[in-house]
Amino acid sequence: MEIGGVVLAAGLSARMARPKLLLPFRGHPLLWHAVSCMAGAPVRPVVCVLGHGSAEITSILRTYTFPQPVLLRKNEGYASGRASSVRVGIESLPESCAGAVFLPGDMPLLRSEDVGALVERYERTGAPIVVAVDEAGNRAHPVLFARSLFPRLAALTGDESGHGLILESWPEVEKVTVPRRRVVDVDTEEAYRRLLESEGEP
């Protein structure tokens, strides 16, 4: 059973004064960590959807070797919102994929084993949605959606994501606990500062 991996990295970084995905962390750009996490997980293929600053990001990512090939896809309509990037990711996956794990590109602390835990839960239960939660049960990323939900994901518009699909079936959603520290996303300057301080970086 094949599960695809989609890294969503097309955003405008609107809440930061600079392109966040290229900010340095542990000697690499933030996005490198998310892509490496996905490429090292039991998913195939891995698609990274780019948009804002795609030329620069592409040139940087191509200097790295990942555990498996990473397909770089540009979302020409990235300014219209997150839904268009989800759609590009889905359209980039082969028909053989039974589902896909979606991961924002600004989560540098997640591990391949965390993605693997979602895949394992899906393979064991067949649940149409498997989501990461922290120790308190709060919804987090990544999220695995079965192919049966791809049409509904592809029909989303604007800044809609799969949040609504998750909420409407929350009691039946399979939850996989991931340590809170690892599901941190970096979407503000303050979040980036806290990330660096937690690592002892200036």
Question: What are the roles of these predicted feature ranges?
Answer:
Residues V43, L149-F150:
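A broad detector of the eukaryotic-type serine/threonine protein kinase catalytic domain
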Residues M1-E2, P151-P202:
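Conserved alpha/beta core of the MobA/IspD/sugar-nucleotide pyrophosphorylase nucleotidyltransferase superfamily
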Residues S13, L23, F150-P151, R193:
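Nucleotide phosphate-binding site architecture
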Residues H141-F145, V184:
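Short glycine- and hydrophobic/aromatic-rich loop-to-beta-strand nucleating segment
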Residues E2-G105, L109-R139, P171-V178:
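Nucleotide and nucleotide-moiety/phosphate-recognizing core
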